[in-house]
Amino acid sequence: MLKVFNPSPVQVGSIECLQSAQNWQRKSLSLQGLNLLQSVLIKLTTGKISITTSSGEYITASGPMLIFLAKDQTIHITMEETHEQLNYNLIELDSASIKNAYNFFLYEHADFSAPLTKPTTKHLLAPIETGVARVFNLLHSSNKSQKLSQDKKEYLIRFLLSEFIYEPEAFALFRELSQNTLAENIYNIIISDISRKWALKDISDSLYMSCSTLKRKLKQENTSFS
């Protein structure tokens, strides 16, 4: 598992922990140290969510709400019922999908001047409009069944991310997230065959680099392999 170097280590888990936690059927749940190696899209249908991020942001939202969380951060998250039972789902988005959407938005909005400055936020929020929930559910279920073509999935992702494009930070954030990190490349290799027990040598061979080079580059990203 990939872990972030922290001065005061906290329990680090994958984002799948958040998805499976819904099955606990609690009125509230709190998870510490979820490490986002890919960007995440959360569809909060009912309930309330509070998130503290390693970048210093505090996010709070109530459903129905679409929440985009950028990769390369660790989050502490609390979710609770409001007047209805807590209901949410999430989808991980890789850099290639975000880059595809970003390039499409630039083409469609040629008159829009995308800022070249670094984004000051690592999240975006949008109310869930008509049709969005249905598209999200289709993409979420297809990720499990692998029934949709890649082109169709890219189209659905563009549709969902278009909900955020009029947010001031959206273009700058999508541009930055279009670039793969080494940690994300490793994550993609591992999830391609989750039944396999991956060793450092396996990963380094897949990336055509030595183990020492791999460890050095990961350290530069403030990440380790264990």
Regions found by a protein language model. Give the residues of each.
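N-terminal regulatory/effector-sensing and dimerization cores
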Residues: 15-118
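A general structural signal for short secondary-structure boundary/capping elements
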Residues: 88-92, 110-116, 134-141, 208, ...
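Short, Lys/Arg-enriched, Trp-marked, Pro/Gly-tolerant hinge/linker segments that flank
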Residues: 119-127, 144-153, 162-202, 206-207, ...
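Key DNA-contact positions within bacterial/archaeal DNA-binding proteins
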Residues: 212
